[in-house]
């Protein structure tokens, strides 16, 4: 089965803290919905740009798109 990487982007000087905080909520959602994550983390690309992400099976695509509204999604 294909895995999908969902990405949420944050901009500005507080982007790192926002992506870390958002990741905590993503993990809570995965636990509540009983969705297994293959990877979940955040990345700091510059002082003004960071993102948080999760990698899950593609069968959860519609559920996550509808409830969490990711900014981007890629095949992982």
Give residue spans per PLM region:
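Long, contiguous binding/interaction regions
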Residues: 1-76
